[in-house]
Amino acid sequence: MNPNVKIIILNWNGWEDTIECLESLFQIDYPNYDIILVDNNSKDESIEKIHDYCAGKLTVQSKFVSYTSENKPIKYYEYSEKRYDTIEMDNKADPSNKLYILKNDKNYGFAEGNNIGIKIALRGDPEYIMLLNNDTVVENDFLSKLVTIAESDKEIGVVGPVIYYYDWDGKTDVPSNICGKVNISSYPGYYDMVDVNKHVDPANADCDWVSGAAMMLKVRDIPIKYLNNQLFFGNEDIDLCINLKNLGYKIINVHSARIWHKEGVSRKKRSSAVIKKVMMEIEVNLKFLKLHNKHYYLYLPLYLLQITLLYIRVSIGKVLPKN
């Protein structure tokens, strides 16, 4: 018995990454999955390029997966936002691995964009929903390994793979994100409040959160199925996991399941808009702190002091993330 998994991918002006991700997914060994590709009103040629890829007119260059024409053309079902209410997901009538393309009328952002996909995915009554970033490439057995572990314990609510950097100075075996712990009482900045494990142990890890870049939810069992759209820039996944953990569900990182993620390098290196990004992190982390610590006001003096120090450090060009 292979429970059905609905995989949700969010695209915004990123068709090259998206078709590489799709190519890796259409070569996995797990037999029972569907892909819901949510386009957040891209302004480039994303939809046209994805059409070309599905038709076999556009190949994929990747160091992790070899392009094949054997599974082309790929059948897809495409819907504009005004037709979302008409979408039906009947796995019994059509058990093949299907691709749904949803075209949003505007850019709803990460949380709400994924929530649109989740809402539609739930119509098919899947056992699992997988949130997967479009700039990832998956190993062919990653989903089989995630499902095996998730099915092994009824208390598991969320599982995730080990995430490696797509390219770290030419290396592909450098862990970017495994899982982590959250200490609400410490400095509430993204890089300090959240402890990220960078060591891959043989045993799976019971943790506080796994990354929303690759997060599989046991949606038939868990009471919380959507991301908090009041948060943004990296905390939606942590918020969901913490809420489920508080309800008694386990959050498990499956160390034998692997994917590669491009975003980790860009976040690590930062950009010319670094101060703006840091201020966004400060804002959302304060919201997160308010949600998860009723005595958050006791930490505000320290919070304000450390915000000032953080701003000074960024202004003089020092690197923020802890290694």
What are these regions (language model features)?
Residues 1-27, 83-87, 91-94:
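N-proximal low-complexity "stem/linker" segments adjacent to membrane-targeting elements
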Residues 23-32, 53-57:
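Short, acidic, metal-binding catalytic loop of nucleotide-sugar glycosyltransferases
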Residues 45, 136-149:
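Acidic donor-binding/catalytic loop of UDP-sugar-dependent glycosyltransferases
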Residues 95, 103, 112-115, 145-226, ...:
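Acidic/His-rich active-site region of diverse nucleotide-sugar glycosyltransferases
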Residues 111-128:
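Active-site nucleotide-sugar/metal-binding loop of Leloir-type enzymes
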Residues 125-137:
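Short beta-strand-to-loop acidic/aromatic patch adjacent to the donor-nucleotide binding site
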Residues 164, 245-321:
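Active-site-adjacent helix/loop segment of glycosyltransferases
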Residues 223-224, 229-232, 238-260:
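Catalytic donor-sugar/metal-binding loop of nucleotide-sugar-dependent glycosyltransferases
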